[in-house]
Structures are given as structure tokens and as C-alpha cells.
Amino acid sequence: MIETERLILRPWLKDDILPFSAINSDEEVMEYLPKCLSLEETVQFYNRIVAEHDRFGYGLYAVETKSDGLFIGYVGFHHFDFDAGFSPGVEIGWRLAKEYWNQGYATEAAKACLDYARINHLFNEIYSFTTVGNHRSERVMQKIGMSRVCFFTHP
């Protein structure tokens, strides 16, 4: 578990599935992703997240607010191995419910994840990527100290 001033980043609970599905089915949240996810697809995603965390001891963390204990999305690490010049690797990523956008939550949680990775010597390199035009994600990347290395076509 990782704590920040306002957030708790923790392992996933089955109770997270329905609010996670609501996030994944929101067209505005999913605007820069291939498609919205159904409940069944969200359950499959949840299972992959839990399996990756079980395998490595870290992964995409469920994010909840300290003030009210509500699940608001995820932030954390994901192993990728798609065909790219920098693959395989570890990505830091985030997805929050839109009512929690523009409040610094993604930046706060992502910084805490990077600090955790540094302190525990988890990775030599961490990547983050987004779709051209997703300025919100680009701003988070900049705020956590990442810099653009390249453009690529995601398979």
C-alpha cells in the first residue's frame, strides 16, 4: 500500500469492479482509448491487473480517497511487450473517474508510485505513453518529470 496526503493506493478488491466498470464505460474517460469496456471486459481487465500484481508484487493500484474511502480509479505500473523499439518495458499509467480530474490526484498518485519504485529499486527505466491530443495525460507526465522520447504507432 502507498499513501499520499489525500490518497491510498492499494491492492484491488472485488468491490472495486462495479465502480471500475463505470469508469471504463464512460466515453469521456475512454476518449483516447480504443473503446469503452463492458462489465465483462472490465472483469477480465481486473483479473489481469490482480494477476500481474500477484506475479510481481506491484502493478496498477486501486486508488481511493482518504477523505471518504471512495474508489476513484487506478495508477501504477504495467509490464508491456508490444512491438516497439523500447519493448519490453514497464509503463506507469493512470485512469481516474472524470469527477476527480483537474484536482491533482493523478499527479499526486503517479509521483508516489515513482517514489516507491525509486526507493525499492524496482526498475531501471519507466515509460509512459498516450495518444496524441490527450493533453491531460501529457500534463501529468510533465508534472511527474517525464519527457517525450519518441512518437510511435501502438499496435
Describe each model-derived feature in a short phrase.
Residues 28-49, 59:
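Conserved GNAT-fold acetyl-CoA-binding loop/helix
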Residues 1-31, 62-155:
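Acyl-donor (CoA/ACP) binding surface of acyl/acetyltransferases
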Residues 51-55:
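PAS/LOV-family and closely related PAS-like sensory domains
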